[in-house]
Amino acid sequence: MTETSDLPAFGAPDATGTQHRLHRGSAEAVVVGLAGALRRYRVAGVDLTEPYGPDVVPPAANGIQMSPWPNRVAGARWILDGVEQRLDVTEPARGHASHGLLRNTHFVTETFSAHAVTLRGEIHPQHGWPFRLTHRVTYELEADGGLTVTAEVQNHTDATVPVAVGAHPFLRIGDVPTAELSLRVPADAWIRTGEDLIPVETLPVDGTELDFRRGRAVGEAALDVCLTGLTPDADGRHRQTLLAADGRAVTLWTDHAFAYTHVFVTDRLPGRDTALAVEPLTAPADALNSGEGLHRLAPHARWSVQWGLTPHVPDHPHEEDRA
C-alpha cells in the first residue's frame, strides 16, 4: 500500500496499514489505518493499553473502532421495515455477525499533526446492510497526557438509519499482571446472556461478583459481561478506573451516549497470561434486534460521541510543566 506522502508516518504500513505516531510531553500513541485502531498508548514509558506490532491483525479486536453496531447481531440477522436482513457471519463458532463492519476496513487519513489524527472509514451497502455511512475517528493527545477519542457517524442516505458504536481498548498498567489489578465501574446492573452470548435480561449487580462500584480485584475471574446503569460524575461523564497497588492507574471516561461498558478478560493476547478489555458501547449486544441503545440517525445527519483515557502515573510531567 502507499502512504500519504505529505503526512508524517511512523513505521512500515504492514498488516495494520498506515501508522500514525502522536506525541505530547511524555505521552505517545500509535493509531493505525486498519479498523481505525489504537495500537499503543503510553505515558512516561508506562503502557496503559495493550500494545501490538504493526505487522499483525489486532488480536482479539484490540483497539478497534466498532460501527454501525458493537458486539453481536444474533444469527447475523435483523429486521428492517419488516424485511429480514442477513449479514455476513463473522463469528462462525456461534453464527453471529460481530463487532460491526469496520474490522477489516483501512481508514483514510484526513488530518495528521504531532498531537492528533483524524481517520475516515467508509461503510458501503452490503449483505444485510443497505446503507452508506462514513465513520470518522479523531484521536488527540491532551496537554495532561490524556487521550481524547471522538467518533462521528455520517448518514449519506435518504433514510433514517439505526446505528450504535463502540471501541475495544485493552487496558493495562505497565507490566503489572492483569490479575493483580483492581477495576472500578460505577454500574448498577449487568446484562445476563445465554450460552450464545445474546442478552436475556438485565439484573442488578447487588450481591454479585459483578459489583465493581467500589472497585474490586480482577483476579482470575473469567469476565465477559456488559454492565449498565452507569452513574455519571458531576460533569456528566462516566468513569471506569483500572488501578495498580502502587497507585498507578488509568481511567476510561465516556460521554452520556455510552450507557454500556463491556468488560472482557481473555488469554488470547500474545505475551500476557490474561488481558482486560474495557469497552465503551452506546448499545449492548444484539441492539439491531432489540432496539436497546440504538441511535436513529436522520437522513444526511451526523452523530458524534466521545470517550478518552486519563493517565494517573506518578511524576508524569504535564506539557505546561515543561514550559
Say what each PLM segment does.
Residues 2-8, 170-255:
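Active-site/ligand-binding surface loops and adjacent short beta/alpha elements
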Residues 123-174:
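Acidic, contiguous internal or C-terminal segments within carbohydrate-active enzymes
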Residues 136-138, 292-297:
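Beta-strand-rich interaction surfaces with strong enrichment in secreted/lumenal proteins
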